[in-house]
Structures are given as structure tokens and as C-alpha cells.
Amino acid sequence: MSYFKGVSIAKAANILYDGNITSRAITFEDGSKKTLGIMLAGEYELNTVNKEIIDIQRGKIDLLLPANEWQEFEGPASFTIPANTKFKLRVHSLVDYCCSFIKE
């Protein structure tokens, strides 16, 4: 989906790693949430609360989930992170992404 309709958008950005990862939260009429963001090149460790589906619009990223090998993704691509998971990212180039939060 290239466009979202009927959403509320947070004015304030979520800023992580001194601005190397930024996103804006959007909430849909049904209460579901996504973030739209940018990641700059670097290595990061993040955590999930809910299951997340990350859609890479453009850019190249490596993902390391617990008990797995590094996996490479280049946009357009998507991957899923389970709930309550600590994971690592190696971002090779500017990444434009959309993250969907899935409550289970």
C-alpha cells in the first residue's frame, strides 16, 4: 500500500541512536499502529514488545534474530520480528521503512 487514509500522525518523532533512527507513529481508525521512518548506516540493537512486520521501501539491511544467522534484505523487502525479541541490525545505506505492530 503506497498511501494510508483515515490516520492520525504524531507530530513528534521517535528518535533513537542520536537521530540515526527516526520515525513517526501513525494510528488508524481501527486502532492499529504503524511507524514510518528512516535509518542511517550503522549497527543497532533493538527490542520488540509486539510482533513487528518491517517493510523496507529502499536501502540495504542485515538482520540478526536470536539463534539465527545474519539475513540480508534489500528494498523492497519485508521481514517479521516476533514479540518480545531483542535483535540486531546492520544498516548499509539509508533505509526507508514502514513498521507494522501486530498485537497477538
Predicted features and spans:
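Short acidic-glycine-tyrosine-enriched beta hairpin
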Residues: 67-87
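Residue-level recognition of conserved beta-strand positions in structured domain cores
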Residues: 38, 48, 65, 91, ...
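Short, conserved beta-strand element in jelly-roll/cupin
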Residues: 48-62
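Ligand-binding loop in jelly-roll beta-barrel domains
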Residues: 82-104
